[in-house]
């Protein structure tokens, strides 16, 4: 009989995990090392799976596992060998990238809705007969609060019902609540439906990284994470350009009609293209099918935790919170990522007022201001793509015999961490002294380069470090990031009124300078920190 595998105990894990840790060359497949065992590394420890020589693989994908101390065997359903095409890790490259691209498209559409409405806020306030500046900012920010709450619910749902169902249901509900925003008759209705749209729209942000980890290996992951990360970064930059001209031409309600149309098109594409990637869900379906075909109700999935759905759901909700509270790696890097991401909305929430007052831009042209930061992010993506994997491989070959370490993702941040505050200084003081409008836009472009590279490097590092719990790690980061992005802009106008545009942006730049050393510290000491027994989390 084919070898069966017993999961060794891990110091960061106390009951059985929802699914095993990623192995070096495949997430759920077996990789014999020629010595009767299989090993794989993960950020905080080593996973060992010992094979028994007296087991043979059955043609239907199930095999007998005889647990130590037991006299009877249990029928366990696994993949049909390490090359099983049903395993998402073994999909063809075209199939992998098609699914990743569609997930990236959904991820782009959701942040697009967050800022597309920003240039139309003055028009909205006029229609609803209010001049409350804080309320105008909150109408934009409340959507981000929905994005903050969503991952805590949607990520656990994907573990219970699969990633595909969460994507599809999220797409449909997002369309419904977006249409409701366009039909709002008062500002309270608009705020409520904006929050709900953000809540259900958070699906790709909550589980997108998990989907990527499901289908990619180490060599493919950097590019895939760059594509996925571009949505949350570039969407907020492009949205105001479209929203500004659309509001000027057809009114603010048409912004929501357009978003609903785009979301509808994306939902249709997703319905026909996306496939399930969550291995526990796939093996559960295979188990149910084999039970019907064979009549053997004793069959169970190799990845079945045998936990009640309620307990699985609660554990999955708690896991991101535990990561933020007890993992310095997750907490510190998520805090850095949250600050960087919040800067996008901090600047964007004030562009309409600043460039109208200081440079006389109208409602349509002020939307173009947001594009400079977006161009910077595209440049940052190009730099990351050209340098990230090359530097990682060079460091692996030179320092670690060709083996990758998550810390090798950090070098592009050495430059990016300095570009971010430099761009903020340039933007703030150029606007303060009414320097020609191209100069402050150049500052936002430079800041955009830094924001993009920092965000991609941190996201990819978290996936490399918490491969088994990549979705939870990114959900934890997304929650903190969205809270920062929703709350900090509420104080933007007050800060600028007290400190001025020059010193106000300088304050943000000094905070960025203070965080810059985090990159170097993690590059040198990150491995010791994530492997320190004090910080091993038990789930």
Swiss-Prot record:
Family assignment from sequence similarity: Belongs to the major facilitator superfamily.
Sequence ranges of Basic and acidic residues compositional bias: 50-69
A single GO molecular function term of this UniProt record: transmembrane transporter activity
Region (Disordered): 1-85
Pfam families with a match to the protein in the record: MFS_1 (PF07690)
Gene Ontology cellular component list: plasma membrane
Principal location class: membrane
Species whose genome carries this gene: Metacordyceps chlamydosporia (Nematophagous fungus)
Disulfide linkage: none
Positions of transmembrane segments: 100-120, 135-155, 173-193, 195-215, 227-247, 254-274, 328-348, 363-383, 410-430, 438-458, 473-493, 506-526
Function: Efflux pump that might be required for efficient secretion of radicicol or other secondary metabolies produced by the radicicol gene cluster.
Membrane association type: Multi-pass membrane protein
Matching Gene3D superfamilies: MFS general substrate transporter like domains
Gene: rdc3
Record field: compositional bias (Low complexity): 36-46
Sites carrying sugar chains: 60, 90, 99, 132
Protein name according to UniProt: Efflux pump rdc3
């Amino acid at each position: 009989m084919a070898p069966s595998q017993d999961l060794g105990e891990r110091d960061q894990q106390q009951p059985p995990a929802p699914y095993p840790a990623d192995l070096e060359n495949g997430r759920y497949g077996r990789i014999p090392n020629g010595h009767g065992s299989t090993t794989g590394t993960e950020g905080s420890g080593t996973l060992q799976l010992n094979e028994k020589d007296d087991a043979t693989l059955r043609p239907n994908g199930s095999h007998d596992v005889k647990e130590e101390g037991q006299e009877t065997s249990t029928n366990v359903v696994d993949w049909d060998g390490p090359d099983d095409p049903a395993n998402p890790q073994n999909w063809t490259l075209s199939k992998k990238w098609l699914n990743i691209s569609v997930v990236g498209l959904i991820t782009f559409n959701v942040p697009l809705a967050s800022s597309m409405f920003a240039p139309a806020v003055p028009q909205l306030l006029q229609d609803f007969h209010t001049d409350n500046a804080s309320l105008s900012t909150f109408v934009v920010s409340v959507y981000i609060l929905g994005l903050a709450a969503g991952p805590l619910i949607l990520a656990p749902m994907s573990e219970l019902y699969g990633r595909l169902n969460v994507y599809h249901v999220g797409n449909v509900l997002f369309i419904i609540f977006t249409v409701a925003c366009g039909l709002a008759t008062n500002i309270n209705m608009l705020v409520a439906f904006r929050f709900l749209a953000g809540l259900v729209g958070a699906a790709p942000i909550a589980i997108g990284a998990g989907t990527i980890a499901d289908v990619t290996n180490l060599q493919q992951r950097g590019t895939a994470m760059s594509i996925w990360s571009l949505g949350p970064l570039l969407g907020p930059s492009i949205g105001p350009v479209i929203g500004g001209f659309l509001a000027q031409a057809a009114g603010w309600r048409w912004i929501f009609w357009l978003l609903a149309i785009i979301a509808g098109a994306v939902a249709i594409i997703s319905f026909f293209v996306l496939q399930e990637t969550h291995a526990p869900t796939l093996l559960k379906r295979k188990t149910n099918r084999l039970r019907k075909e064979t009549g053997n109700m004793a069959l169970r999935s190799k990845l079945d935790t045998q936990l009640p759905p309620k307990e699985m759901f609660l554990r999955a909700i708690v896991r991101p919170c535990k990561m933020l509270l007890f993992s310095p790696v997750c907490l510190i890097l998520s805090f850095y990522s949250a600050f960087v991401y919040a800067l996008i909305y901090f600047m964007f929430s004030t562009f309409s007022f600043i460039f109208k007052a200081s440079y006389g831009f109208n409602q349509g042209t002020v939307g173009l201001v947001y594009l400079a930061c977006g161009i910077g992010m595209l440049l940052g993506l190009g730099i990351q793509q050209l340098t990230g994997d090359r530097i990682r491989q060079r460091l692996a070959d030179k320092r670690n015999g060709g083996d990758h370490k998550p810390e090798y993702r950090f070098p592009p941040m050495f430059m990016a961490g300095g570009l971010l505050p430099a761009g903020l200084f340039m933007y703030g003081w150029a606007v303060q002294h009414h320097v020609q409008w191209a100069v402050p836009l150049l500052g936002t472009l430079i800041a955009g380069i830094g924001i993009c590279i920092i965000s991609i490097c941190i996201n990819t590092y978290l996936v490399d470090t918490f491969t088994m719990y990549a979705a939870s790690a990114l959900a934890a980061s997304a929650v903190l990031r969205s809270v920062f992005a929703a709350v900090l802009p509420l104080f933007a106008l007050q800060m600028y009124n007290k400190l001025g545009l020059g010193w106000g942006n300088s304050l943000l730049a000094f905070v960025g300078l203070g965080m810059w050393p985090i990159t170097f510290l993690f590059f040198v000491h990150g491995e010791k920190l994530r492997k320190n027994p004090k910080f091993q989390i038990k789930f």
